[in-house]
């Protein structure tokens, strides 16, 4: 069985992680966060990629696509090997640019099906406020204003065009993410009840 994938996109602080946790609970998807996989890999002393990832993340740059895809693929393979029924994945924070998308299409063509793109649309200032709030407790080195402004720039320049591309293919489900967590999830539920 091929994995069924929903790409989850939106700026930093749009609430992707929070909503993904709820989707997992309600619909039995497996949540893969590209950023989390990279951060875990960076901490793994045996990783061949650790130092390289560290450098990219520190500079607020996007990690080379081969690394991200190999981590995503490894997780999907392991999940499905453990339980063949678990073939539905939310991939959060990927693809982040043209290079990511081309890498995915080249590597995963015929190996995974992208059902749709869940796009959490949120204004930048709200996103920044949320991240700064989160930074107080998350200990994430990139939850500071300077790093955030860089991340939002990167997102606008690189990820937004990807969303537009999927939009043309009729694959984008857009949600106003500036509302409360519950209101946003109500919208999410409408989409997943229809799309599965």
UniProtKB/Swiss-Prot annotation:
It catalyses: CMP + ATP = CDP + ADP; dCMP + ATP = dCDP + ADP; UMP + ATP = UDP + ADP; a 2'-deoxyribonucleoside 5'-diphosphate + ATP = a 2'-deoxyribonucleoside 5'-triphosphate + ADP. Residues 33-63 are annotated as: NMP. The keyword Cell cycle does not apply. The modification N6-succinyllysine is found at residue 106. It is found in: Nucleus; Cytoplasm. It comes from the Eukaryota. GO terms for biological process: 'de novo' pyrimidine nucleobase biosynthetic process; CDP biosynthetic process; UDP biosynthetic process. GO terms for cellular component: cytoplasm; nucleus. One of its GO terms (molecular function) is ATP binding. Keywords: Acetylation, ATP-binding, Cytoplasm, Kinase, Nucleotide-binding, Nucleus, Phosphoprotein, Pyrimidine biosynthesis, Transferase. Signal peptide: none annotated. CMP binds at residue 100. Residues 133-143 are annotated as: LID. Its cofactor is Mg(2+). It is an enzyme of class 2 (transferase). Its EC number is 2.7.4.14, 2.7.4.6. Belongs to the adenylate kinase family. UMP-CMP kinase subfamily. Consists of three domains, a large central CORE domain and two small peripheral domains, NMPbind and LID, which undergo movements during catalysis. The LID domain closes over the site of phosphoryl transfer upon ATP binding. Assembling and dissambling the active center during each catalytic cycle provides an effective means to prevent ATP hydrolysis. HAMAP family: Adenylate_kinase_Adk (MF_00235), Adenylate_kinase_UMP_CMP_kin (MF_03172). This is UMP-CMP kinase. It comes from Sus scrofa.
